C-alpha cells in the first residue's frame, strides 16, 4: 500500500475479520457469566479531572442552548457505568469508543475501543482473577504473574517506593540516565511514574501477563485505600509484552472522599497551568445514593487484539487510524 493511498484501511481485511471474531469471543465470555452489556453516552457535560488525561471538547447548540453547551468526549465510560451500578443494574460491561486528545503512535490512537466492566461484591483480587481468565482465553497465554508495586520497585530498582524520599528517587533516576528530567521534578508521584515507566515496565510481562497491584495511595484515582496498609490503594494494572493492557480498582464509594480527590486534581491542574475541569456532580450524587461495593477494570481492546494477532502496531488492527479518518 502506498503512503498516499489514505482512503484505504490501515488494517488488512484478514486482520479485521480476526478482530471481529475476538469481539464476539469477548461478548460470549461475559454472556456465559451473566454480565449485562450496556451502552452509555460518548459525550458528557463533565469530564475527568486527572492531570494526565486530556479530553476532546465540543459544543452543542440547539433548543434551549442558543449560547451553546460545552460537552466532552468520554475518556472512559466509568462515570456513567457507576451511575448504572448505583441504580441497581448488577454486573455490567461495555465495549465502546473512548477518546483522549493525546499522542498517536505505535500503541496509541486518540479514538480507541475500551472494554470496561464492573463486578458488585468482588474485591480487587477476585476481579484480577477474572481479567486473567479473559486474557488466557483471548491470547492463549499462560496464567499471569502477580506482584505488588512495592515488589517490582524492589526487584528492578532496589528501592522501596512507599518510603523513599525524592532524593532517593532522583538517585534511582540517575542510574537510568534520567537526571535531566528528574532533577527538576518536584512532584513525588511524577518521579515514581518516571521510574516505573523506564525502570520497571521494560522488565515485566515478557513471557506472561503481569499484574501490578497496590499502587501508592497518592495514585489512588477512583480506588479505595487499603484498610490493611494505608500507604497503598486497591488499584492494579496489567502489562504484557511491553504493553499496558488494563487498569482496575476496588471502587471508591465515599462521595465526600471522591469530591475531595476531584478538587485536589483541579488544584494540581491550576498549579501546572492546566485548565480546571467540570466535576461530574451526577457521579457524586450516585455515590451518595449508594454505590454497591464493587471492583471495576478498563482494558484497551485495540492493544488486546494487537497482541492476539502478533501485530506490530495498533494501525494493523484498526480500520482507520486518526491520520486516515
Curated annotation (Swiss-Prot):
InterPro entries: Aa-tRNA-synt_II, aa-tRNA-synth_II, aa-tRNA-synth_II/BPL/LPL, EpmA, Lys-tRNA-synth_II_C. This is Elongation factor P--(R)-beta-lysine ligase. Transmembrane segments: none annotated. PANTHER family: ELONGATION FACTOR P--(R)-BETA-LYSINE LIGASE (PTHR42918:SF6), LYSYL-TRNA SYNTHETASE (PTHR42918). One of its GO terms (cellular component) is cytosol. Its EC number is 6.3.2.-. It catalyses: D-beta-lysine + L-lysyl-[protein] + ATP = N(6)-((3R)-3,6-diaminohexanoyl)-L-lysyl-[protein] + AMP + diphosphate + H(+). Pfam families: tRNA-synt_2 (PF00152). ATP binds at residues 100-102, 109, 244-245, 300. It comes from Enterobacter sp. (strain 638).
Amino acid at each position: 500500500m502506498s503512503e498516499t493511498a489514505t482512503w484505504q484501511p490501515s488494517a488488512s481485511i484478514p486482520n479485521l475479520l480476526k478482530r471481529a471474531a475476538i469481539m464476539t469471543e469477548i461478548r460470549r465470555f461475559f454472556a456465559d457469566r451473566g454480565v449485562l452489556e450496556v451502552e452509555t453516552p460518548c459525550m458528557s457535560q463533565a469530564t475527568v479531572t486527572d492531570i494526565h488525561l486530556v479530553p476532546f471538547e465540543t459544543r452543542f447548540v440547539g433548543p434551549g442552548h442558543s449560547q451553546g453547551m460545552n460537552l466532552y468526549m468520554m475518556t472512559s465510560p466509568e462515570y456513567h457505568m457507576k451511575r448504572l451500578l448505583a441504580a441497581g443494574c448488577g454486573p455490567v460491561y461495555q465495549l465502546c469508543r473512548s477518546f483522549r486528545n493525546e499522542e498517536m503512535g505505535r500503541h496509541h490512537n486518540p479514538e480507541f475501543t475500551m472494554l470496561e466492566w464492573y463486578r458488585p461484591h468482588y474485591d480487587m483480587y477476585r476481579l484480577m482473577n477474572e481479567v486473567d481468565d479473559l486474557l488466557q482465553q483471548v491470547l492463549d497465554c499462560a496464567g499471569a504473574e502477580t506482584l505488588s508495586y512495592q515488589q517490582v520497585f524492589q526487584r528492578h530498582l532496589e528501592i522501596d517506593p512507599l518510603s523513599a524520599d525524592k532524593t532517593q528517587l532522583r538517585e534511582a533516576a540517575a542510574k537510568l540516565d534520567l537526571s535531566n528530567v528528574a532533577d527538576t521534578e518536584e512532584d513525588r508521584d511524577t518521579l515514581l511514574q518516571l521510574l516505573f515507566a523506564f525502570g520497571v515496565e521494560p522488565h515485566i510481562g515478557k513471557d506472561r501477563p503481569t499484574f501490578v497491584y497496590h499502587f501508592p495511595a497518592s495514585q489512588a484515582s477512583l480506588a479505595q485505600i487499603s484498610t490493611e496498609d494505608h500507604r497503598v490503594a486497591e488499584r492494579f494494572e496489567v502489562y504484557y509484552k511491553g504493553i499496558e493492557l488494563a487498569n482496575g480498582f476496588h471502587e471508591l464509594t465515599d462521595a465526600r472522599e471522591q469530591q475531595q480527590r476531584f478538587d485536589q486534581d483541579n488544584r494540581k491542574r491550576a498549579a501546572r497551568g492546566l485548565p480546571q475541569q467540570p466535576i461530574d456532580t451526577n457521579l457524586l450524587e450516585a455515590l451518595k445514593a449508594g454505590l454497591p461495593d464493587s471492583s471495576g477494570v478498563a482494558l484497551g481492546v485495540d492493544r488486546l487484539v494487537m497482541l492476539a494477532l502478533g501485530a506490530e502496531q495498533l494501525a494493523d488492527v484498526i480500520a482507520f487510524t486518526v491520520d486516515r479518518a
